Amino acid sequence: MTVTESAAAPSPVDRGEPLLRADELVAGYIPGVNILNGCNLDLYPGELVGIIGPNGAGKSTLLKAIFGLVHVRTGSVTLGGEDITNLKANDLVARGVGCVPQNNNVFPSLSVEENLQMGGFLKPGKFAERLDFIIDLFPNLKDRRGQRAGSLSGGERQMVAMGRALMMDPKVLLLDEPSAGLSPVRQDETFIRTRKINRAGVSIIIVEQNARRALQICDRGYVLDQGRNAYTATGRELMHDPKVIELYLGTLAADEIAPED
């Protein structure tokens, strides 16, 4: 199985205003200790943006700050021009922002369909419509709708977590290391799945330790280091930047993930 590089994304000038903007974010978990130190990010409509960098760079903290799970001390987050800084996760879901955390957070004693229902309160007709959409994205779940989530494989649990985040038809989806803990084959499937969701009209920010794979599918990438922006460019440009390769990627593998029609 191979992953092809995405074509260079249209420049931000061609895309109008950002759908989501994080501006000069300063945030942390302990009083007086900052993990983010003036971090910036723009996500344009229809874009797939990757965030990479070394451990402790602030990648996951940036997603948590956007999704209201870490308090932003200074700076702002806007969605469609509306200030959403430090709003609670439920309020962000209502505004069209979904999030899949690292640990997936599926409910093992509930069925797949019951887990998907936890994504939001929908009328029966709307739930059925969204369920059809999610099963189309994740056909492996079709015959497992009544199966308890605790009996699923890691890759299948991740599908459930993604499906639950998509249940409310978000404009923006935040993915925190979706390939973590998966086999190489399942990782490749995850990146194909992520691109498929993006092609269905969802703008995505993906944080990844598997930097090479993330850059192969993303339109643009941000390299974070010590809570700051170190590099920003298209995924292709970052993959071929000698300094980025030396500091963050190592020797690039020749294998690629083939696009899924």
Q: Language-model segments: which ranges?
A:
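Glycine-rich phosphate-binding loops of nucleotide-dependent enzymes
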Residues: 2-261
